[in-house]
Amino acid sequence: MIISFEKLGEKYKIIDLNLNSIKQKIGDSLNIKEIKPTKIICVGLNYIDHAKELNMEIPEYPIIFLKPTSAIIYNEDYIIRPRISKRVDYEVELAIVIGKKCKNIKKDEANDYIMGYTILNDVTARDLQQKDGQWTRAKSFDTFCPIGPRIVKDIDPMNLNIECRVNGEIKQKSNTKNMIFDVYELVEFVASIMTLYPGDIISTGTPPGVGELKAGDVVECEIEGIGILRNYVKDEE
């Protein structure tokens, strides 16, 4: 299906992802459920305004961690609050989708390896994160990685309005220009450590304003030029 996507008078190119050939077709809609990343790399404390909110020093290098691919859900799916957690938070983030295998590349080359950009909600069991002192358990539950609604290529990733709303109320609001490490620096840094494969995701960190999700909530993550990622929240049965 061919679609036309236009917002605020600017036209954007939508990427059609074919995992066999990793083709980029201008104007085709994306079935984001076809993305099969081998890994999801997330970045912590990557917004200047978020660091100020937490009264923390600016990191010298990106702080990275992994989320499992089993946590992925999509637009309009349910986020399930696990029974063992009493506090589950939202975190809206711009996510990079890798288009070509890469290792040890420079930031000036990074754009050649990027398929496009999407939205990721880095859902976190905050109470477990605080108990553990590390992040794996808190960020790895099933349904804790909503992504979507599409992948977009031709936008300026470093000047996008980013926002999270819960039940229509704005909770997070910033711009990607407030990132400490830009998307190209992040690709360079991660690729210096591990090989990146087509479909792999690098999520670029969240702005200030993170907070709790409760059963019955509707959480909407919106990034300029990409769209709205909407999910519903319920408790584990």
From Swiss-Prot:
Single GO MF descriptor: metal ion binding
Record: residues binding a divalent metal cation: 91, 93, 122
Gene Ontology biological-process annotations: small molecule metabolic process
This protein's record includes keyword Transmembrane helix: no
The entry's keywords: Metal-binding
Family under the similarity heading: Belongs to the FAH family.
Protein name according to UniProt: Uncharacterized protein MJ1656
Organism this protein belongs to: Methanocaldococcus jannaschii (strain ATCC 43067 / DSM 2661 / JAL-1 / JCM 10045 / NBRC 100440)
